[in-house]
Amino acid sequence: MTLSWPSPAKLNLFLYITGKRPDGYHNLQTLFQFLDYGDTLTFTPRNDTQLTILTPVEGVADEDNLIIKAAKLLRQYCYQHHIPLRYQGADISIDKKLPMGGGLGGGSSNAATTLIALNYHWQAGLSDETLATLGVTLGADVPVFVKGHAAFAEGIGEILTPASPKECWYLVAHPGISIPTPTIFTDPELKRNSPIRSLGALLQAPFANDCEMIARKRFREVEYLLSWLLEYAPSRLTGTGACVFGEFESQEAASEVLINAPEWVHGFVAQGVNISPVHLFRSRIPVLLHP
């Protein structure tokens, strides 16, 4: 059975860095929400063990693609735990809409969708909790995509508490550049001492992103784009960038700003959703049983 699975974007509605750990990672507090917009991954199970990307991503070798890494990780876990699989290979196509290095979680989302989809197609029968534990070895953001609910994240992003922020409409704009995460986190001027607060306190305060000042200072494209968007709506950087987003009360309001935007502005309008489109899709497809 061939199925096309959503691989949604995420936004960091706020992001505060509360300290740097001895191992070099940063402790943070952030609020993840999904978007009803993203990539689409199509999986066709194979009777052999081949894992083939039919639509290679430019600049990313197959062996470095998180999709392939996730598939191999799932298969290896099942081998090690003597879990029988209906299939062990797959042909995979990617309809790529999310920019790399954009702060929208595209790679992590692809990995999570792969774990969820192949768990279904291969009939491995693993729980989302197990898939999330596998996923964190691929990236700190993978578990939130696997678990599929908007969440308040702490620690390095691995401590998740389900949350239900308002499902607003957003204009998400991309400045045409990629920002590697280490570029932001290694900057000596990055704020690393935000106070640790409860989710309730954070929801009552104006939302902000501690990475934004560095991104605006080091990348003029981000500065120009955010300055433009702030004229129309409360706007922030997502993650470590490079994408920015403005918050609107309606799809029409966000779309009107995008339609009338300068030619150099590239973006899309999407709604924030607290249940991942991947989980909604999975709930609507038939349960597969071993023959």
From Swiss-Prot:
SUPFAM superfamilies: GHMP Kinase, C-terminal domain, Ribosomal protein S5 domain 2-like. It catalyses: 4-CDP-2-C-methyl-D-erythritol + ATP = 4-CDP-2-C-methyl-D-erythritol 2-phosphate + ADP + H(+). Keywords: ATP-binding, Isoprene biosynthesis, Kinase, Nucleotide-binding, Transferase. Coiled coil: none annotated. It is an enzyme of class 2 (transferase). ATP binds at residues 99-109. Its EC number is 2.7.1.148. Pfam families: GHMP_kinases_C (PF08544), GHMP_kinases_N (PF00288). Catalyzes the phosphorylation of the position 2 hydroxy group of 4-diphosphocytidyl-2C-methyl-D-erythritol. Belongs to the GHMP kinase family. IspE subfamily. PANTHER family: 4-DIPHOSPHOCYTIDYL-2-C-METHYL-D-ERYTHRITOL KINASE, CHLOROPLASTIC (PTHR43527:SF2). Homodimer. This is 4-diphosphocytidyl-2-C-methyl-D-erythritol kinase.
